[in-house]
Amino acid sequence: MKLMNVVKLMIRAIARAKKTDKPIVYIDMDNVLVDFQSGIDSLSIWEKNQYEGRYDECPGIFAHMKPMKGAIAAFEVLNKHFDCYILSTAPWDNPGSWQDKRLWVERYLGKGAYKRLILSHHKQLNFGHYLIDDRTKNGAGEFMGEHIHFGTDEFPDWFSVVTYLTSENK
């Protein structure tokens, strides 16, 4: 039996155990749901100089980030068709970012969504049908379902992702 068939069987078993027939979708935060640049833009000149090249380590940066264009509406649409989780990585050297990410999810995606937040540096350990991520780092490139590479020519924005995932021809 091919590895992909085994993975699909495992995913179905997990879905049955959870009593859902909806496909599982994981959605990254930074530069997918969250506009990371908006956080950088909110920093003081001192903070920009102090944390240049490692802005994710700046305390409080995640609390100031805005949603990516179309991200909130896309999440709402996908949530109707899929079993959605937020799968993100938080920097080890900025423990406050873990809390800020949780608060961001609650603020923009609703009170119940924070219970669907998973913070991990090993995204490949999560079983699901799709991972929407802008990078291949932290296990995204080894994800056993389909990696929807956000921000690429094929999936440049949320409209293209939602269109692809909700198409009848899938």
UniProtKB/Swiss-Prot annotation:
GO MF entry, a single one: 5'-nucleotidase activity
Could you mention a single GO BP entry for this protein?
pyrimidine deoxyribonucleotide catabolic process
Give the binding site residues for Mg(2+): 28, 30, 134
The organism's place on the tree of life at top rank = Viruses
EC number(s) per entry: 3.1.3.-
- List, from the UniProt record, the residues annotated as the active site of this protein: 28, 30
Q: Name one Pfam family in it.
A: NT5C
Q: Which UniProt keywords apply?
A: Hydrolase, Magnesium, Metal-binding
Ribonucleoprotein in keyword set? no
**Membrane spanning stretches:** none
Record InterPro entries: 5'(3')-deoxyribonucleotidase, HAD-like_sf, HAD_sf
Q: What does it do?
A: Dephosphorylates the 5' and 2'(3')-phosphates of deoxyribonucleotides.
Name the UniProt record assigns to this protein: Putative 5'(3')-deoxyribonucleotidase
Origin organism lineage: Viruses, Duplodnaviria, Heunggongvirae, Uroviricota, Caudoviricetes
